[in-house]
Amino acid sequence: MAIHLYKTSTPSTRNGAVDSQVKSNTRNNLIYGQHRCSKGRNARGIITARHRGGGHKRLYRKIDFRRNEKYIYGRIVTIEYDPNRNAYICLIHYGDGEKRYILHPRGAIIGDTIISGTEVPIKMGNALPLSTDMPLGTAIHNIEITLGRGGQLARAAGAVAKLIAKEGKSATLKLPSGEVRLISKNCSATVGQVGNAGVNQKSLGRAGSKCWLGKRPVVRGVVMNPVDHPHGGGEGRAPIGRKKPATPWGYPALGRRSRKRNKYSDNLILRRRSK
């Protein structure tokens, strides 16, 4: 991703650094609907995820995470911006006339060809099962957890996992979070890294740009009232009045593990991610 700096004319352009993406106005049957987030509310209208709401209207892009168009070569026609994710997406035209969106592999350009199947070359953008001749140390993304369900791991911008080992019916992967876990060798993955890896270098420059993304302001608990937060209350700039920081619901805020106990996948995780 190329970072674009504007000539300084306003405070927002002075502090902003955006990616110089190419937005496409392509309209096809893969772009549909008015995709609006739930604004952090559940079905009863109660806030379950804070700091969400507003944002610009979005159209949903149907992404092919399954890559089940087997043994048919496809050509990258466009590289487009997707408002629903940080990664870019590619429009693929397959030889049988099928058109699908996939996540943009880093380094792929317009005109490149991709293919999916069991006996395909180990090439960037190709999708194949882990049980094939994929060498150890291969960088992969869009990894399936359940066979046939589609990729669920390593799909964010710049995400990449590494194939560490193969033994028996399982393959050992190191995920972007640092977690090391087992995956069935029958599951598929895409070779390469997800594009737009420099998205963390982007600076929005002003609060209004954050609102366009559907992210609302974050208020510190120490400036709230006692009824709203355990850190609230006091006269002037008072300390939190506790030994350790707490969440708005009174639980320890720093270092507390939030993963549920006795999950089915506990036996598959060889090393936990670093918190």
From Swiss-Prot:
Where is coiled-coil annotated?
none
Write out the annotated subcellular location.
Plastid, Chloroplast
Mind telling me which Pfam families this protein's record contains? Ribosomal_L2 (PF00181), Ribosomal_L2_C (PF03947)
Q: Which GO terms describe its molecular function?
A: rRNA binding; structural constituent of ribosome; transferase activity
Tell me the keywords, alphabetical order.
Chloroplast, Plastid, Ribonucleoprotein, Ribosomal protein
Q: Which domain of life is it from?
A: Eukaryota
Q: Does the keyword Transcription regulation apply?
A: no
Gene Ontology biological process terms in this record = mitochondrial translation
Q: Which GO terms describe its cellular component?
A: chloroplast; mitochondrial large ribosomal subunit
Name the predominant localization: plastid
Q: Which InterPro entries match?
A: NA-bd_OB-fold (IPR012340), Rib_uL2_dom2 (IPR014722), Ribosomal_uL2 (IPR002171), Ribosomal_uL2_bac/org-type (IPR005880), Ribosomal_uL2_C (IPR022669), Ribosomal_uL2_CS (IPR022671), Ribosomal_uL2_dom3 (IPR014726), Ribosomal_uL2_RNA-bd_dom (IPR022666)
Report what the protein is called: Large ribosomal subunit protein uL2cz
Source organism of this protein record: Populus alba (White poplar)
Q: Species lineage, top-down?
A: Eukaryota, Viridiplantae, Streptophyta, Embryophyta, Tracheophyta
Annotated gene: rpl2-A
